[in-house]
Amino acid sequence: MHAYRSHSCAALTAANVGETIRLSGWVHRRRDHGGVIFIDLRDHFGITQILCDPDSPVFAEVEKLRAEFCIRIDGEVKARAPELVNEKLPTGEIEVYIRDMEVLGAAGELPLQVFGDQEYPEETRLKYRYLDLRREKMQTNMMLRSDVVASIRKRMWDKQFREYQTPIITASSPEGARDFLVPSRQHPGKFYALPQAPQQFKQLLMVSGFDKYFQIAPCFRDEDPRADRSPTDFYQLDLEMSFVEQQDVFDTIEPVLRGVFEEFGDGATVDQQWPLISYADAALWYGTDKPDLRNPIKMQIVSEHFAGSGFAIFAKLLEQEGTQVRAIPAPKGGSRKFCDRMNKFAQEQGLPGMGYIFWRDQGEGMEAAGPLAKNIGPERTEAIRQQLDLGVGDAAFFLAGKPSQFEAVAGRARSVIGDELGLTEQNRFAFAWIVDFPMFEADEETGKIDFSHNPFSMPQGGLAALDGDPLSVLGYQYDLACNGYELVSGAIRNHQPEIMFKAFEVAGYGADEVRKRFGGMVNAFQYGAPPHGGCAAGIDRIVMLLADTANIREVILFPMNQRAEDLMMNAPSEPMPDQLMELGLRVLPQD
């Protein structure tokens, strides 16, 4: 017999009755009934009920066991009485009578219980992650992640992609986030960087003549934490192709992701048609570039109904350049209580409030109610109702000003309205491509022009477009949104040095700086670079959606906390003085 087990804790059935077996695992739960000790023994595969009566030669040792002791037992498989069969367990027809037991690893007092669904502070869960990972839900999440990655790899291979590994130590480059710098011992005063993405290397692969590339790539970014983003590192399905246009990339990645969501989506509907929505329309209709299309609400501009109206606040705002009034329709939201709650929500988000109109039954007709309705009058109110296609029991909310000042709040309000009114469809994965991103953006305070998205993207219109207004230039850049999350980001690359230098010049980077920062890629493009493009899909977010959790740390084995700390490994930590000396570094005191 094997030193530790003859079967897993999920393998024994009525067919094994009468056999002498060996199991190893953890004490999941222990119960004493009339002098008999019952133990649920757990391993990675499942649970088997074992019991020890006072006649057992190891009864005294079994009495000392506590939760999460790791043990090996030998025993005899016996059938449970019919009324004691547990149909919820694969092993529910049997139990094992202990004849021998060995403690493989004793357990101290537990900071968190593995058994049950009790909630614990996240700090506790992360500090004792090895205990947290023993819980069934966490094991399920991690196995799901492994299965998803394996499925992605197979689907990419089936599309004639091959996986290549790119360097983990490289040069720093401006790709939208802060770098993690690595000091060089052999070159004092100089630093490597952990790659924010394999961006330049995968493009260089295309220049090297490889037609298709993919990688399950680790990426490192020193970012502010969010529930859907790790503050230090993440994994992505990274891919690149030569001789492609934007639609070719869509046609490649769509069946891969659609297949993964159908395979692991637990029966949820997966949209078959993935619409293309311009960045401008996404901002207008949804207040975000990662809309949740399960929510049917579309915002609309209704400025004409307030211009010159009796509602002076909006009317005066509309006299200013670049302002508008935007409406958020709220089907079934027509109660003053709900409208007041949404107005309070806007105030909590930092806005003065949110105007509203709601429509109610009035005898044989319909009445528009709320302060706005009184101020703008029945004709304008009716025109708004018709434009928004609303009726009795419905409402509409209004925000005014420059879109940059209220758009994000409007998007969040749309989500809250959809959720609270039950409009957001459940058990569905709704995808949409967001396209036509602005190539550049201007700092609101300084007016400085910089890249808004990916600096290596091809501008729509090529070199000629860069001679005009930078803020009107669109890039061949695209994101894929699913249920309110950005899952994929990509672009058709700028493979022509002349256009690349011009694009960086618009963003304030001189030719010498471009050569210094991106010399490897710029030099490579002098030797016949093919048109190429690709994208990257976030593995962590894909699994997060499939696991039906809003916290990305639930699908990462050993995540950092929100302050970018690893409480289990005590990272970051202070270096030893001799390490700093060897690297030629000194830690300056912090104010």
From Swiss-Prot:
GO cellular component terms attached to this protein's record: cytoplasm
Pfam families cross-referenced by the UniProt entry: GAD, tRNA-synt_2, tRNA_anti-codon
Keywords (A to Z) from UniProt: Aminoacyl-tRNA synthetase, ATP-binding, Cytoplasm, Ligase, Nucleotide-binding, Protein biosynthesis
Domain of life of the native organism: Bacteria
GO biological process: aspartyl-tRNA aminoacylation
EC nos: 6.1.1.23
Record's subcellular location: Cytoplasm
One GO MF term: aspartate-tRNA ligase activity
Functional summary from the UniProt entry: Aspartyl-tRNA synthetase with relaxed tRNA specificity since it is able to aspartylate not only its cognate tRNA(Asp) but also tRNA(Asn). Reaction proceeds in two steps: L-aspartate is first activated by ATP to form Asp-AMP and then transferred to the acceptor end of tRNA(Asp/Asn).
Name assigned to this protein: Aspartate--tRNA(Asp/Asn) ligase
Lineage: Bacteria, Pseudomonadati, Pseudomonadota, Alphaproteobacteria, Rhodobacterales
